[in-house]
């Protein structure tokens, strides 16, 4: 009977550890600056930019703890056309406390960009990571606001699995 109780306790402990490592959710805030370049095209314009910023997890579970800091770098492409605007960014987020990086694709088709008061909502896809974030996937919703033409603040709500 004692062995049976031990095996049940061990199973529950291992199960809870694997589900803890299997995923979770977190909310983060990221602020930073863009450097933009733009050209006209036959049906609108294309704008590209590089982003660098700093972030912090404000609420999280699993591997992402509240107070965890990050550095972000993105290459952004904005295409203005008669049907609207497509905004895409490929980003690398570095989490020094985890000695790991996370790779993301951001997409947005609504809202404004690159002027004071501009804002919009979009979707981020977590594509993978390195070291402790190897195998991570997931999605995030985000809201971004421009304080001026180059300075932004974004709020990100993510769920992930490993």
Language-model segments: residues:
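Sec-dependent signal peptide recognition
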Residues: 2-9
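Acidic/polar active-site rim loop that often engages polyanionic ligands
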Residues: 12
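N-terminal signal peptide c-region/cleavage motif recognized by signal peptidases
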Residues: 15-19
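Beta-strand-enriched cores of mature, soluble protein domains
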Residues: 22-162
């Amino acid at each position: 009977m004692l062995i049976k109780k031990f095996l049940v306790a061990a199973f529950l402990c291992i199960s809870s550890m694997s589900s803890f490592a299997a995923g979770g959710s977190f909310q983060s805030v990221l602020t930073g600056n863009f450097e933009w370049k733009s050209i006209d095209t036959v049906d609108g314009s294309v704008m590209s930019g590089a982003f660098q910023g700093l972030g912090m997890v404000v609420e999280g579970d699993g591997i992402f703890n509240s107070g965890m800091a990050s550095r972000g770098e993105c290459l952004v492409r904005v295409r203005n056309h008669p049907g609207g605007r497509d905004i895409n960014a490929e980003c690398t987020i570095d989490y020094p406390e985890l000695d790991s990086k996370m790779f993301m694709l951001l997409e947005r088709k609504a809202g404004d960009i690159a002027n004071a008061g501009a804002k919009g909502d979009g979707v981020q896809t977590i594509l993978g990571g390195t070291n402790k974030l190897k195998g991570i996937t997931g999605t995030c919703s985000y809201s971004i606001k421009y304080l001026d033409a180059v300075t932004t603040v974004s709020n990100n709500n993510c769920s992930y699995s490993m």
